[in-house]
């Protein structure tokens, strides 16, 4: 840690990475098409955590409430309030109210614009960052466990086992070069 701290760029990169990673762990609270919390008839509801039918908020259907629907939102606001996340889109929510055809340029509603299907780019970046980093961490952990186990077997048994494992690893490491 002291070596990283001595390098200013490395130190700031570490803090920026950790901040982005921690924020991405709470992606549902930052970018979601469901409210974080809402009050209806003096009852608190947490749509990010639980599913509620539309009938719970004065709607007609037993299906999960579509909170971005103007009718449902109006029903809730008549008898309560809603707290939305900063980005009102999830990674797969399509913005049907775009002023121009998708992909749309940045706007107040979509900070980095939308992709070719009308999905918010910021929301997709947040969720994608989390998936990519967690995948990398899990892959590193699994490969470390396999490597330590293989090295332990080679060291304990030695001889032909060690030779076979080494040849297998040499062939395995050469495979990416073939493609």
What are these regions (language model features)?
Residues 1-144, 148:
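Gly/Trp-centered helix-boundary motif
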Residues 127-130, 134-138, 145-179:
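Cytoplasmic-entry segments and transmembrane alpha-helices of multi-pass inner-membrane transporters
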């Amino acid at each position: 840690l002291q070596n990283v701290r001595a390098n200013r760029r490395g130190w700031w990169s570490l803090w920026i990475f950790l901040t982005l990673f921690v924020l991405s762990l709470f992606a549902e609270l930052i970018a979601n098409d469901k409210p974080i919390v809402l009050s209806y008839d003096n009852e608190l509801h947490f749509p990010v955590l639980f599913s509620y039918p539309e009938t719970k908020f004065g709607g007609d259907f037993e299906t999960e409430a579509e909170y971005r629907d103007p009718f449902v939102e109006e029903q809730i606001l008549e008898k309560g309030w809603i707290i939305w996340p900063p980005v009102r889109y999830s990674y797969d929510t399509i913005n049907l109210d775009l002023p121009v055809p998708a992909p749309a340029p940045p706007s107040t509603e979509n900070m980095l614009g939308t992709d070719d299907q009308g999905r918010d780019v910021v929301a997709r970046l947040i969720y994608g960052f989390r998936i990519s980093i967690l995948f990398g961490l899990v892959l590193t952990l699994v490969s470390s466990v396999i490597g330590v186990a293989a090295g332990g077997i080679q060291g304990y048994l030695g001889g032909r086992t060690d030779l076979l494992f080494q040849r297998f690893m040499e062939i395995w490491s050469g495979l990416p070069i073939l493609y």
